[in-house]
Amino acid sequence: MSTVDKEELVQKAKLAEQSERYDDMAQAMKSVTETGVELSNEERNLLSVAYKNVVGARRSSWRVISSIEQKTEASARKQQLAREYRERVEKELREICYEVLGLLDKYLIPKASNPESKVFYLKMKGDYYRYLAEVATGDARNTVVDDSQTAYQDAFDISKGKMQPTHPIRLGLALNFSVFYYEILNSPDKACQLAKQAFDDAIAELDTLNEDSYKDSTLIMQLLRDNLTLWTSDTQGDEAEPQEGGDN
């Protein structure tokens, strides 16, 4: 693929984003990734935004359908229809996740030439295995939970050694890893400890905040604090959803 073709694909991805056609955006950035050339920061973010929206729509649908399916007053037929529809959405969600994980393992992680990119992609790997864990059961769930935790931990270890505590990618990783502990592993203490440590470490080094990423970093710090408030409150309702990181 020529440089011109690649630039056209990136331009198409931007047009798709502006028109909120995220499936088109994801396919354009998938093609860019499959050239095998390391992505620029802009391209990396376009890929992440595209798939986050594509998978996010299915995650949201899955939650709604699951709650309808669990309503005891629904007739057996209604519950059956809801189950069949949920399974269809699950199939779509799994296909998207494995598509992303394939790109990460084949192209993105091996080509990552700096710690920032490596952490970004390992975090992404943790995220997409976490999305699989949300809908999996039994042994299949155990496998994807382990894969998610391994990817997050690898990213976490690199980020602690190579990145400032105020770096938005390191903060976003801590945010999502803590959500993994809270929601997937049912470990609120570990989730709070991780989120609090990340927040405190960033506060202690606020003077290292990069002007370019100031907004991103402070936003994620706010999300960490919001989750800590949510997780430590006794009056937490069942409907409350923890905040997840963006695409830094």
From Swiss-Prot:
One Gene Ontology term, aspect cellular component = nuclear membrane
Query: Which InterPro entries does this chain map to?
Result: 14-3-3, 14-3-3_CS, 14-3-3_dom_sf, 14-3-3_domain
- Which GO biological process annotations does it have? chromosome segregation; germarium-derived oocyte fate determination; learning or memory; mitotic cell cycle, embryonic; oocyte microtubule cytoskeleton polarization; positive regulation of hippo signaling; positive regulation of Ras protein signal transduction; positive regulation of torso signaling pathway
The protein's location, in the record's own words, is: Cytoplasm; Early endosome
- What protein am I looking at? 14-3-3 protein zeta
What quaternary structure, including any partners, is listed in this protein's UniProt entry? Homodimer; homodimerization is not essential for modulating the activity of Slo. Interacts with phosphorylated Slob; the interaction with Slob mediates an indirect interaction with Slo. Interacts with phosphorylated yki. Interacts with hemo; this represses 14-3-3zeta activity which prevents the 14-3-3zeta-mediated activation of phosphoinositide 3-kinase Pi3K68D.
PANTHER family the record matches: 14-3-3 PROTEIN
Which family does this protein fall into?
A: Belongs to the 14-3-3 family.
